[in-house]
A protein has these predicted regions:
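Alpha-helical membrane-interface segments at transmembrane helix boundaries
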Residues: 9-13, 41-44, 48, 284-287
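Peri-transmembrane interface segments
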Residues: 47, 238, 251, 264-287
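Subset-of-secretome marker
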Residues: 76-78, 82-91, 103-107, 116-119, ...
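Juxtamembrane alpha-helical signal-transduction segment immediately C-terminal to a transmembrane helix
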Residues: 26, 36-39, 47
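Hydrophobic, regular-secondary-structure patches
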Residues: 41-123, 130-133, 148, 226-227, ...
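N-terminal Sec/SRP start-transfer signal
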Residues: 1-30
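Mid-to-C-terminal secondary-structure elements
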Residues: 130-144, 155-267
Length: 287
């Protein structure tokens, strides 16, 4: 009788131990899955922030030829693409989830821009009055463009802090003259990005992915662009979304509105390898 009771208690105890071990294994397994998922989500968020930047939410819609941005340095403006009209501008700024929008022209590399004997190797932008607020810049030295300078073909230029470091030693850039394609432009201000976000760099590959190379940026009023470059060049659009997750939809809609103004018979059909069209730089998809 006692032996039966003892065996019964041993059986119950062994089952309980197995149950406890089973439960412990399940708990450990679930915890491991949660940890892995959390790590992956954290890594994805870090990559997203590295590519997009913290609190920026800007979508860049540019004119493309095939898979590459259209290069105005070596090509004339395509016949079927016109300057963005006031009506299209209003439609874009009124889009859902668009906080602000700016329209600009650019040269990604300048081969005939000098301060004294020093050549500038950065980018040139012809901007409107909304650009600095949309892109997240603030005046660090001097001043921004006056309202009249956006409309009266003023030969004024603003540098970013990187351009200042590349061109000047210790002297102030304010009041100095920059030669842009043979035309003298006076420096009226220096701007810097408001956001202090810095990407997390863990390797050399990360550095080139997130930072790249830059000789800085120069900005001139959009109306002054033809003084140094060409008349009636098509513009790009920089649209600021209300949040990061809205960026893909904003980029797609802005590109659709701008593409609707292109004469398709002049720039190729959909699917052509050299088709010219506006497209958004989808950093969120890349992330």
């Amino acid at each position: 009788m006692l032996e039966n009771i003892r065996l019964s208690l041993q059986g119950i105890l062994s089952h309980k131990v197995r149950s406890i071990l089973t439960m412990l294994g399940i708990i450990i397994g679930i915890a491991a899955i949660i940890a892995i998922v959390s790590t992956i989500k954290g890594t994805n968020e870090q990559i997203k922030n590295n590519l997009i930047g913290s609190g920026n939410n800007n979508v860049n819609v540019q004119l493309y030829q095939g898979e590459s941005p259209y290069d105005f340095s070596y090509q004339a403006a395509p016949d079927g693409v016109q300057v963005v009209s006031a009506e299209v501008r209003d439609q874009i700024t009124s889009l859902k989830n668009v906080e602000s929008a700016s329209f600009y022209r650019t040269r990604s590399y300048c081969d005939n821009v000098y301060y004294q004997n020093t050549q500038f190797s950065g980018s040139m932008y012809g901007i409107d009055a909304a650009y600095f607020d949309t892109a997240g810049y603030e005046v660090q030295q001097g001043r921004g463009f006056l309202s009249k300078e956006y409309t009266n073909n003023a030969k004024a230029v603003i540098l970013d802090s990187t351009a200042v470091k590349s061109l000047y030693s210790s002297e102030s850039p304010i009041g100095s003259v920059i030669d842009i394609n043979g035309e003298p432009f006076t420096v009226v201000g220096v701007v810097t990005e408001v956001s202090s976000f810095e990407p997390v760099i863990n390797s050399e590959e990360d550095y080139w992915t997130y930072m790249g190379t830059s000789g800085g940026k120069m900005f001139i009023p959009g109306q002054s662009w033809p003084i140094a470059y060409r008349y009636d060049e098509p513009e790009n659009c920089l649209a600021k979304a209300v949040d990061t997750d809205s960026m893909p939809a904003v980029g797609k809609k802005v590109a659709e509105l701008m593409n609707a103004t292109i004469r398709t018979n002049s720039v190729g059909k959909e699917g052509d390898s050299n088709q010219i069209k506006y497209d958004s730089q989808d950093l969120l998809k890349q992330a």
